[in-house]
Amino acid sequence: MKESERYEENQFKGRNRRLLNEWRRLEDRLEGRRDIQCEAVRRNTAGLPVRYLVRYNLRSICGVSDVEHLGEPGVCNTPLYASGYQMLIDIPDGYPSIDAPASFRFLTCDDKGRPMAHPWHPNIRYFGDFSGRVCLNQPDTYTDLAWCVERVAHYLRYDTYHAVMEPPYPEDLKVASWVIRQGEPNGWIFFDQE
């Protein structure tokens, strides 16, 4: 029995009913998958998840060989790879209203503050105070969390990315520039595609 099945939908209204449905969709869509696992790590007073930890067991780019000289002419920055990433999904109190979307952020440090591999992708912030933040252009407020989790898996595989300087602009302009100038021309972003 899935954990969400312990709850009856008719015992909830409004936001809590939406939270239950999101939880069920995540459990259904990710059931039996080895490449993506999801667990509830914080709950509200009704026992429904408001924070998830998503583990991606996918090979993806996690940086480049000479990041200190990124963008300098003549410097070849080959990609570095990792196979495990962790992302938090935080659901704010006003979710799912348009001004209270869920936030998606890859962990960049472990619980002791040591750096950990996080994705190098133009739609995921790599540098700065907001490193790890994921830019997801969701079609509408009815887009479920499971769609977002699967979309991020496409990001990690480089099946989907937006690196050109036009709307909706890339989340990380430095990574986007690398994708255009080195990643695409050298074929480095084309790996493990299904």
What is the role of each PLM region?
Residues 1-84, 94-194:
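UBC/E2-like fold recognition across ubiquitin and ubiquitin-like conjugation systems
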